[in-house]
């Protein structure tokens, strides 16, 4: 007979049920001139956002949004936007761990796929592939929590 040391508690599980591209766009407004050799590399700005919505008690839709814009001085060289999602089954985690799982672990699992899509679309647009550096989702989550706490404090102060 096996020993049952978990006292009826279930082991935490995190699994991807589906992954999908919700929105993808690439704009090359200066083509074909933008494809010519240039003296300096364009400035690239990347914005990242993560959202999660419950689908059921255990299933969540987690969406990673990546927005990249390359500029040469004030002219847009290219602009790409990707909204990449995953349906995750998250079960057995204590309630206090749910937000970190949804906003850190789930996007960490989605990121390599989203990064590859961005690299492919920029390459297919005539540019070198844009290889986005790894993202620190833990730091992003901590910043988001701090901003929400600061916002709650401001709203709690009577006028």
Curated annotation (Swiss-Prot):
Where in or outside the cell? Cytoplasm
What Gene Ontology terms describe what this protein does at the molecular function level?
unfolded protein binding
| Gene Ontology CC terms, in alphabetical order | cytoplasm
Q: Name one GO biological process term.
A: protein tetramerization
- The protein's predominant localisation is cytoplasm
Q: Is Protein transport there in the keyword field?
A: yes
InterPro entries recorded for this chain? Answer: SecB, SecB-like_sf
What UniProt keywords apply to this chain's record, in alphabetical order? Chaperone, Cytoplasm, Protein transport, Translocation, Transport
* SUPFAM superfamilies attached to this UniProt entry: SecB-like (SSF54611)
Pfam families according to UniProt: SecB
> How does it associate, per the subunit comment?
Homotetramer, a dimer of dimers. One homotetramer interacts with 1 SecA dimer.
Role according to the record: One of the proteins required for the normal export of preproteins out of the cell cytoplasm. It is a molecular chaperone that binds to a subset of precursor proteins, maintaining them in a translocation-competent state. It also specifically binds to its receptor SecA.
Q: What protein does this entry describe?
A: Protein-export protein SecB
**Organism per entry:** Rhizobium etli (strain CIAT 652)
User: Which taxonomic lineage is given here?
Assistant: Bacteria, Pseudomonadati, Pseudomonadota, Alphaproteobacteria, Hyphomicrobiales
